[in-house]
UniProtKB/Swiss-Prot annotation:
The gene is grpE. The lineage of its organism: Bacteria, Pseudomonadati, Pseudomonadota, Gammaproteobacteria, Lysobacterales. Belongs to the GrpE family. This is Protein GrpE. InterPro entries: GrpE, GrpE_coiled_coil, GrpE_head. It comes from Xanthomonas campestris pv. campestris (strain ATCC 33913 / DSM 3586 / NCPPB 528 / LMG 568 / P 25). Gene3D superfamilies: 3.90.20.20, Head domain of nucleotide exchange factor GrpE.
């Protein structure tokens, strides 16, 4: 027994009065609920951050490939100008020079907008960028390398817009 306060027994202090048990249960219940709310808030925050990243990536892709349709429709124009330059030969003339200048200006504008020309003569065949239309033999070109290009290919911001149509050197 406690001598200062005989009404309190030290053994009584170690035991919980019956009315505190429901309070402890409620405190534990509230702690569990707080933990669940914190976990939900953390998940929501992570979902929001993932959504922000996804939207930023989508906006970046939309910006990078906004000109895809226009540049794709200009590819036949590039082909025609290239064919015209080939047909005009190598002799300088005002018409050929004008055609060459126009072609170079158009290619520069396209390049400034992310277009890259694929002209793979002499390079190893790459099925991700080239479409083989036949095989042939060529002096000085290793087997499996591009011998001739029938139609140039193009990349738009490193994504294939049109494969190059090529002839590949035969393997012996």
């Amino acid at each position: 027994m406690n001598q200062d306060h005989p009404e309190f027994d030290s053994e009584d202090l170690s035991q919980n009065p019956p009315e505190t048990d429901p309070l402890k249960a409620e405190i534990e219940s509230l702690r569990s609920e707080i933990a669940l709310v914190k976990a939900d808030a953390l998940r929501e925050r992570a979902d929001l951050e993932n959504q922000r990243k996804r939207i930023a990536r989508d906006v970046e892709n939309a910006r990078k490939f906004a000109n895809e349709k226009l540049l794709g429709e200009l590819l036949p124009v590039f082909d025609s100008l290239d064919a015209g330059l080939t047909a005009a030969g190598t002799e300088p003339s005002p018409l050929r020079d004008g055609l060459d200048l126009t072609y170079k200006q158009l290619l520069k504008v396209a390049a400034d907008n992310g277009l890259t020309l694929l002209d793979p003569v002499g390079q190893p065949f790459n099925p991700d960028q080239h479409q083989a239309i036949s095989q042939g033999e060529a002096e000085g070109i290793a087997p499996g390398h591009v011998v001739q290009v029938f139609q140039k290919g193009y990349l738009l911001n490193e994504r294939l817009l049109r494969p190059a149509l090529v002839v590949v050197a035969k393997h012996d």
